[in-house]
Regions:
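Hydrophobic alpha-helical segments
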Residues: 1-162
Length: 162
């Protein structure tokens, strides 16, 4: 059971929980879509980052949208996922992250890509922490299908724009 009742707005239960503050919800999801489907890093890499931290944070809704697929990770994706997990695990002391973490990232990523990865990881941690805090239930089958369709359309648009 969620800590608060979902707002009477359209969308999935996560959107409905944020829907108590419509202006924030609209901007949050616009930022999500912009970062997810635009930028230097692929939407597929970003999705693996999202999936990799969902279980650890405890957002049941977020985790129900797809489990990580470590078998599909190339070196860049594996490094991105490891970085996001390291950021999450050390969130209480981000100053304490060893410089070696960034040295390894720089073997595969440009500075601009590291910035994008850092912002994406922290944005996902924040959103998923909200889901965990509100104890949002797992997605329904229809919500999962809608999420998959939304991702597929966004990824296709990103490919067409490239």
């Amino acid at each position: 059971m969620s800590r608060i009742e979902p707002a009477a707005v359209s969308g999935n239960v996560f959107q409905q929980m944020m829907g108590h503050r419509p202006g924030i919800m609209e901007k949050w999801f616009a930022l999500d879509e912009s970062m997810r489907f635009q930028g230097l890093l692929s939407p597929t890499l970003k999705e693996e980052v999202r999936r990799s931290i969902a279980d650890g944070i405890g957002c049941r809704f977020c985790a129900s949208l797809g489990a990580p697929d470590p078998d599909s990770h190339d070196r860049r994706t594996a490094l991105a996922v490891a970085f996001a997990q390291t950021v999450f695990d050390n969130f209480h002391d981000l100053h304490g992250l060893d410089d070696e973490v960034f040295a390894v990232l720089k073997e595969e990523f440009s500075d601009a890509e590291i910035v994008e990865l850092s912002i994406w990881s922290l944005f996902m941690i924040a959103g998923q922490a909200f889901g965990a805090l509100m104890q949002i239930r797992p997605s329904t089958a229809a919500e999962l299908d809608d999420y998959k369709d939304w991702r597929a359309a966004g990824e296709a648009a990103a490919r067409d724009a490239a």
